[in-house]
Amino acid sequence: MVSFKCWQRSYLHSLTGNRLRGAFWARNTRVKSLAAASSTFVELDQSVVKGGNVTEIQAYKSEEVTWDVDGIAVYGTLTRPAGGGKRPGIVFVAGSGPTDGDWCSPLLPGTTCSGRLLAHALTEKGYITLRYDKRAAGPHVRENLLRLVGKMSMQGHVDELAGAITSLVSTDNIDLSRLFVLANSEGTIHALHYQLQAPLHRFTGLVLTGAPGRPVGLVARDQLLMQAAQLPNRDDLMKRYDACIEAFVAGKPMVPDPLLPDGMKDLLRSLETPANLPFARELWVENPADLIAQVAEPILVVIGKKDIQVDWRKDGRALETAAAGISNVTFAYPENADHVLKYESRFREELTAAEVGVQYNAEGRVLDHYALSVIVEWLSQQSGVNL
């Protein structure tokens, strides 16, 4: 029997039940010193520690920044590389649900989170990076949720990102002609919407990772279908599920069919939770392929072949079709990268939704070296940063 338990957390919590360097990120040593409103972190890369002696130290400064969206504070972490001169900037946009700026989630165990690893790796390369907690994520989520009931929307997510850009461009030594975004999963949709709306401070280039290429509701349905693969009454269950979704999308009252598994019913109930509206209904019909075709700036799409939340063939093909004839859209499908760009050694056929999500941020997990290399090289080409 396939368990639908993980679907209590649903697509809204990271497209299935949620959320660079290479293997040497596994055992970094951190020395932390606090000063006033900022923190300085010194990362000691184990690849340069030999015989107990540190031969090289890469240092950079991280500080907390905040901005306001509809009267609610958004908290971010700005990380600057050592040295002066004008620097390109990168804003990170997390995936769905309570995924925070580090791409950690209270729904998933572990703190080895890809957003933080990517930000540190790219800061080492010379970029100023900014990652932030959505208002419905991070340590302030409890106090924010009551204020967000009935107000959660696609535009609200874009406004959070716009605030991040405003904060980034006000940073000393940022190069306004070299602004980038690195988004994951649902965050890629918000990045595309921002790019199509922004009159100022448009991104020089967009890195879209784990990007859905089909309507979000269809991607979520495929995930359910995969979990139900071994059920003898799968087809009947999916018809009942589809009827509920049809009512939901149409804005009609939706009562989960009592014959559906508990996890499916929990997913359907979560869609109509007041705290998730109108956002959930907007998200369910969103088609990223319609957006990517409208963006003029260079785009890099990275979908790992070990990603079981979006399908590199189905979603990648949909995005490639939408971008046909556009010369500045690049696609990369790393062989061993999962949804959050971690290295996954197992065959894709061995991976199940129930256990993959809980391993995303597990201790010892590292970013996929090839995925990171693709991102670093593409950003270097677009920004002029020497590797």
Residue ranges of predicted features:
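Primarily recognizes the serine-hydrolase "nucleophile elbow" in alpha/beta-hydrolase
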Residues: 167-173, 177-227
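Short alpha-helix in the alpha/beta-hydrolase fold that links the catalytic acid
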Residues: 297, 308-322
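Short, surface-exposed "cap/lid" segments of acyl-processing enzymes
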Residues: 83-121
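N-terminal cap/lid segment of alpha/beta-hydrolase-fold proteins
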Residues: 45-85
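Catalytic active-site module of serine/aspartate enzymes centered on a nucleophile-bearing elbow/loop
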Residues: 337-341, 346-387
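Accessory cap/linker subdomain of secreted extracellular hydrolases
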Residues: 139, 201, 207-291
